[in-house]
């Protein structure tokens, strides 16, 4: 049985240098190899013309460059593109490309499904299967860059920003997310600045503390409620790490970080008559008084079977005005890609749920139906 080849997309620069040293090659070759992979989009060692033939043969014998394949894509009327990415065993994750006048953002997934159970999120309703590997995370960027055209082909960087806001909770896959973000930041990798790579979390406090010790990227936090009572329902991990504990961890991260320019991005999905009253806006403003932040108000994007509705524009406007009375920076996020179910909270993919969450939900619904009949 032949030895499984090492996928170079799984290795950040230190990892690739260590591999080359173990192979008896000079570590500086790692920079050259990474440039071929991430700047030129090369997956064939024979195309790496500044590496000698013997080394190319040695690499081909032990290594490979394999990214997950795009199985399908949909393009929205606003230019947003949602990609279905095959990660094996009949499973898919979703990745979303969002073009704007001054940037091109890719929303990247970190897990097959999600281990958290946020009640307003379509991904959460699908259950959870596993963490994505480093190559499956950076492979989303690599594959979409191929689709759009690499910088060396087009003269322009196809993706200027990456947000870890796709399927999954990134901090529950820290071992793979950190090396993947290292590749995003590395000048020999995708070469993005630390302010252009954003990790979004629902509040895994111990992992957030670890994150601040190993990497500096922009941080976004999913709050969605102004108090623990409501957040326990909307974001159940709050029962383990309540708001004050989460906010303290955010402040600790900000003390270590330069990428955030001293403030965190707070995400707050607007659910009609659930978390969008003016009283709740006052409560949220007071909650955040000691945590420097920019607040993104996100109109809820309904999905089939969702128990919530989207707040009206007038309720969102009133909520925003209250927050601004406290001198808070508030942005009402423009919904992108909702006509192809690519908007915030709508990503679902194709998941073999190991938690049996979806099956349990369907059984409960059928039992309710039988009782009512």
Curated annotation (Swiss-Prot):
The active site is at residues 94, 344. Pfam families: Radical_SAM, RlmN_N. GO terms for biological process: rRNA base methylation; tRNA methylation. InterPro entries: Aldolase_TIM, Methyltransferase_A, RlmN_N, RNA_MTrfase_RlmN, rRNA_lsu_MTrfase_RlmN/Cfr, rSAM. Its cofactor is [4Fe-4S] cluster. Disulfide bonds join 107-344. [4Fe-4S] cluster binds at residues 114, 118, 121. One of its GO terms (molecular function) is 4 iron, 4 sulfur cluster binding. It is found in: Cytoplasm. The keyword Disulfide bond applies. Residues 100-339 form the Radical SAM core domain. Binds 1 [4Fe-4S] cluster. The cluster is coordinated with 3 cysteines and an exchangeable S-adenosyl-L-methionine. Its main location: cytoplasm. S-adenosyl-L-methionine binds at residues 168-169, 200, 222-224, 301. Keywords: 4Fe-4S, Cytoplasm, Disulfide bond, Iron, Iron-sulfur, Metal-binding, Methyltransferase, rRNA processing, S-adenosyl-L-methionine, Transferase, tRNA processing. GO terms for cellular component: cytoplasm. It catalyses: adenosine(2503) in 23S rRNA + 2 reduced [2Fe-2S]-[ferredoxin] + 2 S-adenosyl-L-methionine = 2-methyladenosine(2503) in 23S rRNA + 5'-deoxyadenosine + L-methionine + 2 oxidized [2Fe-2S]-[ferredoxin] + S-adenosyl-L-homocysteine; adenosine(37) in tRNA + 2 reduced [2Fe-2S]-[ferredoxin] + 2 S-adenosyl-L-methionine = 2-methyladenosine(37) in tRNA + 5'-deoxyadenosine + L-methionine + 2 oxidized [2Fe-2S]-[ferredoxin] + S-adenosyl-L-homocysteine. Belongs to the radical SAM superfamily. RlmN family. HAMAP family: RNA_methyltr_RlmN. Specifically methylates position 2 of adenine 2503 in 23S rRNA and position 2 of adenine 37 in tRNAs. m2A2503 modification seems to play a crucial role in the proofreading step occurring at the peptidyl transferase center and thus would serve to optimize ribosomal fidelity. This is Dual-specificity RNA methyltransferase RlmN. The gene is rlmN.
């Amino acid at each position: 049985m032949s030895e499984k080849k090492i996928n170079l997309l799984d290795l950040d620069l230190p990892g690739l240098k260590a591999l080359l040293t173990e192979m008896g090659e000079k570590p500086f070759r790692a920079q050259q190899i990474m440039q071929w992979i991430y700047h030129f989009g090369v997956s064939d060692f024979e195309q790496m013309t500044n590496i000698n033939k013997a080394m190319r043969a040695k690499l081909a014998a032990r290594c490979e460059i394999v990214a997950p394949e795009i199985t399908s894509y949909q393009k929205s009327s606003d230019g947003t593109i949602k990609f279905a990415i095959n990660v094996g065993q009949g499973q898919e994750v979703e990745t979303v490309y969002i073009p704007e006048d001054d940037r091109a953002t890719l929303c990247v997934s970190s897990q097959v499904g999600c281990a958290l159970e946020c009640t307003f999120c379509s991904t959460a309703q699908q259950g959870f299967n596993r963490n994505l590997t480093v190559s499956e995370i950076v492979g989303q960027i690599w594959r979409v860059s191929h689709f759009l055209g690499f910088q060396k082909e087009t003269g322009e960087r196809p993706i200027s920003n990456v947000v870890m806001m796709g399927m999954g909770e990134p901090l529950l896959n820290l071992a793979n997310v950190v090396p993947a973000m290292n590749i995003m930041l590395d000048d020999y990798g995708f070469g993005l600045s630390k302010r252009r790579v954003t990790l979004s979390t629902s509040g895994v406090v111990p992992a957030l503390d670890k994150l601040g010790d190993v990497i500096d990227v922009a941080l976004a936090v999913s709050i969605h409620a102004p108090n623990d009572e409501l957040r326990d329902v909307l974001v159940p991990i709050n029962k383990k790490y309540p708001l004050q504990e989460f906010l303290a961890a955010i402040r600790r991260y900000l003390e270590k970080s330069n990428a955030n320019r001293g403030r965190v991005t707070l995400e707050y999905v607007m659910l009609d008559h659930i978390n969008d009253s003016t009283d709740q806006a006052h409560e949220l403003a007071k909650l955040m008084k000691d945590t420097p932040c920019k607040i993104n108000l996100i109109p809820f994007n309904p999905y089939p079977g969702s128990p919530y509705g989207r707040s009206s524009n007038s309720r969102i406007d009133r909520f925003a005005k209250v927050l601004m009375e406290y001198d808070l920076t508030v942005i009402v996020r423009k919904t992108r890609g909702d006509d192809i179910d690519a908007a915030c909270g709508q990503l679902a993919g194709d998941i073999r749920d190991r938690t049996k969450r979806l099956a349990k939900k369907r059984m409960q619904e059928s039992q309710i139906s039988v009782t009512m009949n």
